[in-house]
Structure formats: C-alpha cells, structure tokens
Amino acid sequence: MRLKVSCTEFPIQQWVETSSLELVDSVNCVADLCHAIWMFNGGCADWRLQILKEGFTVPMTGIISQYLKTDDHIKIVKEIYPPNLPVLPFRVYTTQNTSVESELVEWEDVEMEA
C-alpha cells in the first residue's frame, strides 16, 4: 500500500510504503500505518489522532480503510484533551481475514457517528 501522508506535528509529508514500517499490506489498514508513523516519531500521551479528508475528520479508533483508498492524500491531525480528562490511548485493530480492498467503501456512503 502506498499513501501520501502529512502531519503538522512532525516533519513528514511524503509517500510512505507500508512495508517500510513492517506492515503487511494484506492484513493491515490505513490506521495501522498512521499509528506506526506516530509512534516512530515519539507517540502521544493525551492526544487523540484523527484522519482529515475532504474537510472531514475521522477518529483513528476503527478500521479507517473503510473511508480511504490506498492512494488517497491524507493528513493526520490531533485533538487535545484537558490533562484531567481520562482518555485511553487509541488502539488500532486490524481485520486479519480480509484484505484492505474488500473493506473499502465510498466516502459519501459512510455514516459517521457524532
């Protein structure tokens, strides 16, 4: 999988091959790639990361490959929470028995929860 990734929190704005982060394209999703990039660059304690696409943000708490195509240009953004607010570190889950391609749906067809 090849993705265009940019993030203001660390200096990265380039094409990234998932294989360079030891991710297997057939079982890992876009959120796994973003999580690996973020952790490689120091991780985060009280931020919740989101994917930004076409003016909409999607929390990185699920299988983000449902919202993105493999050649999409995405941006990682953050939402800061107060220090006293209990926020669990986001956890990315992969679907082991399906390919990314089989999980893709059109962006407009996805209903996002508030």
From Swiss-Prot:
One GO cellular component, as annotated: nucleus
Origin: domain of life: Eukaryota
Name of the protein this chain belongs to: Uncharacterized protein C18G6.13
